[in-house]
């Protein structure tokens, strides 16, 4: 997963819920040095009996914001969506550099 162009990641989920699996996996895909490279990562853990829906919010360097439905999307779909926009930004960066 291309994380170079991601500036903000916010998650809210119940760690005991099966519906939050995609949000947990997405956080595990982020590199260990993401915070030191300028990415703002915010995680809010909900109590076990919470009925709030899980949330995954991603913001890119170009200002695009994505609110992803982690309850109904699998991790592959989420990574696809994020990578799709990251590849567009990568192409633009390559064109500007080249």
From Swiss-Prot:
The question of whether Manganese is a record keyword is answered with no
Q: Which organism is it from?
A: Neurospora crassa (strain ATCC 24698 / 74-OR23-1A / CBS 708.71 / DSM 1257 / FGSC 987)
Keywords, A to Z? Mitochondrion, Ribonucleoprotein, Ribosomal protein
- Put simply, this protein is called Large ribosomal subunit protein mL53
**Assembly behavior:** Component of the mitochondrial large ribosomal subunit (mt-LSU). Mature N.crassa 74S mitochondrial ribosomes consist of a small (37S) and a large (54S) subunit. The 37S small subunit contains a 16S ribosomal RNA (16S mt-rRNA) and 32 different proteins. The 54S large subunit contains a 23S rRNA (23S mt-rRNA) and 42 different proteins.
Q: Show the GO MF annotations.
A: structural constituent of ribosome
The entry's cellular-component GO terms read:
mitochondrial large ribosomal subunit
Outline what the protein does: Component of the mitochondrial ribosome (mitoribosome), a dedicated translation machinery responsible for the synthesis of mitochondrial genome-encoded proteins, including at least some of the essential transmembrane subunits of the mitochondrial respiratory chain. The mitoribosomes are attached to the mitochondrial inner membrane and translation products are cotranslationally integrated into the membrane.
* Pfam families, A to Z: MRP_L53 (PF10780)
Family, per the entry? Belongs to the mitochondrion-specific ribosomal protein mL53 family.
Which compartment or compartments is the protein found in?
Answer: Mitochondrion
Asked whether the UniProt record includes Ribosomal protein among its keywords, one would answer yes
